[in-house]
Amino acid sequence: EMQRSLVGSEMCIRDRYMDMWKAAGVKVIPVVASVALARRMEKYGADAVVAEGMESGGHIGEETTMTLVPQVADAVSIPVIAAGGIGDGRGIAAAFMLGAEAVQIGTRFVVSKESIVHENYKERIIKAKDIDSTVTGRTHGHPVRCLRNQMTREYIKLEQEGKSFEELEYLTLGTLRKAVQEGDVKNGTVMAGQIAGLISKEQTCKEMIEEMMDQTEKLLGRC
């Protein structure tokens, strides 16, 4: 049987699950959007936490990476991994200065040559401008960052009309699959962070990592 060595989760992890994973020798690294949640995860036994700012794509919190990371770093003794709005060496170097020991990068790697998302999805991110992302779901406490399109315009319109959570949820059923697998970037959910405007080309993961680390090392060498 395959043995899992690491669990990462964007959902609030309960202590009973943490105990089960730890007993199996699994490293647990939950994603947190607040200091309180970071402290709770440390108390439960997390090996590290990902402090994710609202600049990231997908489900988000209310704090920015700039404000969240240093506060989490001061509040816990376990390693802090910064996420949200990081897409090059400048973002990595900044995260280290804020107190992070590592970074988590999502949106840039979505457009890597190894990524299996639809080419239309990649192209939409590459062509995105700095102001092309929007947040849906705020009215019912489930904010999600994605790129603007026909679906987000319809969703926000219904939000403003006061539609129920169930009605809004029905609108989004299957829309992530529609964008990721079918390539419908007009009616699907194109989850991507605000850093999308910085991405201009498709590269291999190796090329991305080498480019980012070279830039990071040069910047930190100035300190």
Residue ranges and their predicted role:
Residues D19-V32, A75-A83:
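Short beta-strand/loop segments at the ligand-binding rim of alpha/beta enzyme cores
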Residues E1-I13:
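Single conserved hydrophobic/aromatic residue that forms the stacking wall/gate
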Residues E10, G53, T107:
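Short secondary-structure boundary segments
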Residues K27, V31-P70, D74, S112, ...:
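Glycine/Thr-rich beta-alpha phosphate-binding loop at enzyme active sites
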Residues G25, G45, G85, G99:
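Conserved functional loop/turn residues at catalytic and ligand-binding sites
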Residues T67-I81, G87-C223:
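Conserved active-site-proximal phosphate/metal-binding subdomains
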